Amino acid sequence: MMLKPQYAILRFAKYKGPEIGHIEAHNERTKEKYASNPDVDTSRSHLNFHLVQPERKYRAEAERQIAEAKCRIRKDSVRVVETLVTASPEFFKGKKKAEIREFFEEAVRFIEKHQSKDSIISAVVHMDEKTPHMHLSFVPLTADGRLSAKDIVGNKKKLTWWQDEFWKHMVKKWPDLERGESASETGRTHIPPRLFKEATHLNRQRDMLLQLLGEVNPLNAKKKSTEIE
C-alpha cells in the first residue's frame, strides 16, 4: 500500500484592524462556543499550549511595537501577520504530545531566523481540532524599522521562497516531509482559514438538509436540491 505524502505546510494571512480581535478570540480560545467552526472540540481545548505567551491584547501589542519603532503608518496598514504552521494529518499519526511540541518548536525557530523574535505576539498550538496546527502572530516590522508586510511576506515569489526555506529547515529533522505547494504554484485562490471552515460548515448543513428532504419525499429530493443551489 502506497503511503500518503506528508507535507510541511506554512501559510500567511494579513490583518489590518478590527479583524485582529477576531483572530485573537479564535487563537486564544476566549469564546465558549465556536458555531462557525465545528472542528473545535472545546472538551479538548485544555490540550492546547503556547510556545510564545501573549503579554497583552494582539492589537494593543501591535500598536505598542509600531509606536516604539516610530515607523510611518497608514489607516489601512497591515498591523499583524498570522502564520499558520501544520503538516499533513498522516505526519502527526502516532506521535506523542512531546514529539508534536518539538515539531512546532522547530517551526518557531525557523520564523525567528527570518523575523525578529521580539515582534512575535503569540504562538499557540491547537490540539482541539482535527489536525494539530500553530497560529503564530507577529508585527511585520522590517530590520530597518519599517512596518511592511509586503516586504516580509511579499508577492508570489517571496511566498514561494518562504515555502522553500521552511521545508529545507524542517526536513533536516523529519526527512519524510515533502514541500507543500503554494497557491501561486497550484493556481488556486487562497481562502483565509476562518472563511474556509465556515464554507465547509455550510456545505455540511446543506448535505444534511438534502438528506432529510430525501427521507421525507425521495421523489422530490432532486427537485429540492436544484432549488437550494
Regions found by a protein language model. Give the residues of each.
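N-terminal nicking endonuclease/strand-transfer module with a His-rich metal-binding environment
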Residues: 1-229
